[in-house]
Amino acid sequence: MKTLADVFREALKEKGISSIGTLSKRFRKSKNKLQDIAIEIVHGKGAVFRVPEKTAVAWDLNGNRVDGSYYAYAPLCMREKFEPVLTPEELREKLPDWPYFIIDLYHWDKHTQKEKGKICLQVNQSYGLLRDYFTGSELAVTWANEEFREMFHGPLDRITTYGGPTSEFLKENGINEVVLLDPWAEEVLSEKDFDVKAFIIGGIVDTGGNKKKTTPKIGEELESAGIKVRRRKIVLRGDVVGVPDRINRILGIILKMMVEGKSMDEAVYEMQEPLHARWRLRKELPKRATRYMVEGKVYRVVEKELFDEYSKWLKIRWEDFVKVLRELDLVALERKRIHHLNKISNARIINGKLHRVILLKRAAMLCYNC
């Protein structure tokens, strides 16, 4: 799927432009200059002009720095001084029909003030993610009441807000089928789902208490209004545990899969925080534990090398690994030491579970022979 930068690049090529600069050296610093310039043009802040002298700073169409350019982005007020080459109207006409990413605030009043603040923050961060790929106006917030508008400190004029139900917003935009991101769904999100014109990615934080399993209810309400709903979940190696639950991070996973072509596991890893990784680590480590019994006391032991294995697909640091070990009362030993323990122990079933019982006399003899 094309990004706004791709569309802008093609528009410049059509005009025979191979590089573009800015009249000010203080233009926003970022990794993707074409995207940032295109955003400002789409929102009517400026245009591309032909200038009589080369600009001090410029980039080619791949974003690489070049010596200068006779084409520059500048505010629209410069129309009287320079010849416009690419205007906001021209660029908007070339924009593809990108899907909406909807945050449904129907359950807004079930949240505490602190949780409402979290929602506003995540909406703002979601806009920041979308403007890295598209224009940002693809982010739609439905059931956007006055309280939300007052609490939201982001660019309200650059996102799409709708005061009514999601179903009405969809119908007004000619959309009759959506993908609902639901951790309780049976099917996993895939490339086949990227043909829809709207994704509903949340609107709920802290899914405990009176908000438990409210996401499926959003789907039921849409279906009752005649909207076809594809319920999909995001998983990491087949399990939802370890998948970020913040609205903006779910959106980031979708964008990395849809636009960058990354696999789901890759996208989840890139958007994961150590907190989410520890959730999954708590589930994985006990599966790899071996029970050793010494003089009636049981120790659950895992290989220390598991850290290297799990860190390939979980965003964990060594301190996260140690923290989970302590929480689960596990002991980590080097693999060679575990092999040694297996030599001096016998396997026995105790209370229906496999234990390795270490015989101290045998251990002493082996150590003596060493």
UniProtKB/Swiss-Prot annotation:
This protein's UniProt keywords: Cytoplasm, Methyltransferase, S-adenosyl-L-methionine, Transferase, tRNA processing
Protein name: tRNA (guanine(9)-/adenine(9)-N1)-methyltransferase
Enzyme class: transferase
Family: Belongs to the class IV-like SAM-binding methyltransferase superfamily. TRM10 family.
Molecular function via GO: tRNA (adenine(9)-N1)-methyltransferase activity; tRNA (guanosine(9)-N1)-methyltransferase activity
Protein's GO biological process: tRNA methylation; tRNA processing
Gene3D superfamilies listed in its UniProt record: 3.40.1280.30
Disulfide bonds: none
Main location: cytoplasm
Purpose of the protein: Catalyzes the S-adenosyl-L-methionine-dependent formation of either N(1)-methyladenine or N(1)-methylguanine at position 9 (m1A9 or m1G9) in tRNA.
Domain SAM-dependent MTase TRM10-type: 87-292
Catalytic activity: adenosine(9) in tRNA + S-adenosyl-L-methionine = N(1)-methyladenosine(9) in tRNA + S-adenosyl-L-homocysteine + H(+); guanosine(9) in tRNA + S-adenosyl-L-methionine = N(1)-methylguanosine(9) in tRNA + S-adenosyl-L-homocysteine + H(+)
Keyword Acyltransferase carried by entry: no
PROSITE patterns reported for this sequence: SAM_MT_TRM10 (PS51675)
GO CC terms: cytoplasm
Source domain of life: Archaea
EC number: 2.1.1.218, 2.1.1.221
Organism of origin: Thermococcus kodakarensis (strain ATCC BAA-918 / JCM 12380 / KOD1)
Subcellular location per the Swiss-Prot or TrEMBL entry: Cytoplasm
